[in-house]
Amino acid sequence: MKTYLTLWFSSEGTEPTKVAERLQGMGFKPITGQYDHVYDWKDTVALHQILKLCTSVHQTLKGMHVLYKIETV
């Protein structure tokens, strides 16, 4: 499974490079195309694990004035 992250930045928020560094520290990799970052689980995961990652993303981006969308497939 993979979790994809799409980001929307504000000119009043944190610089995109700093946001990307934070997300990379969590295990996300920047990509090009439809999504901005991907987290590769390398296997099937339970819903509670996905929700735990979503909570971590939320806390990491808090205060950075970044909107985001998470999709796991």
Model-derived regions, located:
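Long, contiguous binding/interaction regions
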Residues: M1-Y4, S10-V73
